[in-house]
Structures are given as structure tokens and as C-alpha cells.
A protein has these predicted regions:
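A detector for short, charged/polar N-terminal pre-domain segments
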Residues: 2-9, 81
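Core segments of cupin and vicinal oxygen chelate
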Residues: 6-11, 17-68, 103-106, 110-118, ...
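Short active-site oxyanion
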Residues: 13-15, 92-93
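Conserved, structured core segments of small domains
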Residues: 59-86, 90-97
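Short beta->alpha transition motifs characteristic of CBS
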Residues: 119, 137-141
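Short, acidic, Ser/Thr-enriched surface-loop or helix-capping motifs
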Residues: 129
Length: 141
């Protein structure tokens, strides 16, 4: 094993994994929202509920970015946003650049998202996916 040089080794984020009570259904939502194809799915494991499984989406050709993975969480509890003491906390969220916030909000709602009650910024809209994960639509430069 080599000694550290003081510089970080090459580390590259390749995926973001999202917990879901039905990962294939949530992948379908994000596929419609983003226009990405679902690249891989896995069925429920033997002895697990039908919702068990896994799905992965990759950016379309020409777009650079990590894959989005969706994995089964049997005891999934939707996060509360903004956070409240003693309630399920947000672990991560997606920021999605858009050309027009209003158009993007309408699109997101048409495929199954809803706007969060709290909207802290004028040029950003906090949306909730079908299982309650927040994601932000923000005006790109």
C-alpha cells in the first residue's frame, strides 16, 4: 500500500442511490420527469414483497453525470421538509437545472410531483416526488 501524498486520490462520484418503498415505480417517475431511460431493473428477491428490487437510470448520450439508483427500503418513511425536530430528516436531494421554472413545475406536476408547501427562494421551486423526496427545480444560467 502506498503512502498518502497529501493530495486526494482520484475519487469520482458515479451514482446517487435513493431509498424507496417501490424502487421500480419511483424510477418510472424520474424517467418521465427527466426523459432518461431506465437502464437496469432487478425483480424482488425470493421471499420479499413484490415492491422489493432495484432500478438504475443513466444520463442520456451526450449528458455527463452520475447514474440514479433506486433501492428498496422496507421501512421507508418519507422525509419532512423543511425539517422538524423528532421527524424523519432529509438525507439528500436532487437539484435540477431548468430553462424556465414555471414550465418545469407544470411538467413535474403533470408526471406526478407536487410542490412543497414551503418555498424559500423565488427562482427555485421545491418539489416532492411521489414518495415524498424533495427535489429542486432551479433556473440555470
Amino acid at each position: 500500500m502506498s503512502e498518502p501524498t497529501g493530495l486526494p486520490p482520484l475519487l469520482r462520484v458515479t451514482s446517487v442511490t435513493v431509498a424507496a418503498p417501490d424502487p421500480r415505480a419511483l424510477a418510472e417517475f424520474y424517467s418521465r420527469l427527466l426523459g432518461w431511460e431506465i437502464a437496469v431493473t432487478e425483480p424482488a428477491r425470493p421471499g420479499f414483497p413484490a415492491e422489493d428490487g432495484w432500478a438504475q437510470m443513466a444520463p442520456p448520450p451526450g449528458q455527463v453525470g452520475p447514474t440514479l439508483n433506486f433501492e428498496y427500503e422496507q421501512d421507508y418513511v418519507p422525509p419532512v421538509w423543511p425539517s422538524e425536530p423528532g421527524r424523519q430528516q432529509l438525507q439528500t436531494h436532487l437539484d435540477i437545472a431548468v430553462a424556465e421554472v414555471g414550465v418545469a413545475v407544470a411538467w413535474a406536476e403533470s408526471v406526478g410531483a407536487r410542490q412543497a408547501a414551503h418555498q424559500p427562494q423565488e427562482h427555485v421551486r421545491v418539489m416532492l416526488d411521489p414518495v415524498g423526496h424533495p427535489f429542486c427545480l432551479f433556473l440555470s444560467d
